[in-house]
Amino acid sequence: MSANSHFHSTHESHYQCAVCSSIDANPNSLAVNYQCLADGSVVGGFHVLPRHQGYTDLLHGGIASSLLDGAMTHCLLFRDIQALTAQLDVRYHAPIELDDHVTITAYCEGERRGIYQLVAQLLVNNEVRVTAKGKFIRPKEA
């Protein structure tokens, strides 16, 4: 089964996601399309529009962190692992401006005692602007 067809079966767990759902499923979604690469890492793209700003002409920091969190989540979803963000440490290195085209990347560093460690970054013109490290855990069965 390919990563993309495999993804569709797990994506239903959050089909109205504010970051990655289609505009049809959630009109307020950022509608980011993440792709799984052969090495298991994830890449996506995002165009910064005026509605995404916090400070004048700059991408809102909360949206930046959501893009990173979404990419890390997809690293796990593509592996058929549904996990929740337990910790997200974000570093803002340089601002992202309106009309920037952002490349989003993420990969899984590993898993220890049921905790997945992931890393993600936002780049503009191959320059790192924002980085994050995250820890994810599987939800307990109800």
Language-model region placement:
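Active-site helix/loop of acyl-thioester processing domains in fatty-acid/polyketide metabolism
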Residues: S41, L58-A83
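Residue-level recognition of well-ordered beta-strand positions that form the cores
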Residues: G45-H47, D89-R91, T105-Y107, Q121, ...
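Short beta-strand micro-motifs enriched in acidic
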Residues: Q35-L37, Y107-E111
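Hydrophobic beta-strand-centered segment that forms part of the acyl-chain substrate-binding groove
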Residues: A71-T103
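Non-catalytic linker/capping segments at the edges of enzyme domains
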Residues: M1-R51
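HotDog/MaoC-like acyl-thioester-processing domains
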Residues: M1-Y15, I96-L98, E109-A142
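Short histidine-centered catalytic/ligand-binding loop motif
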Residues: V48-G62
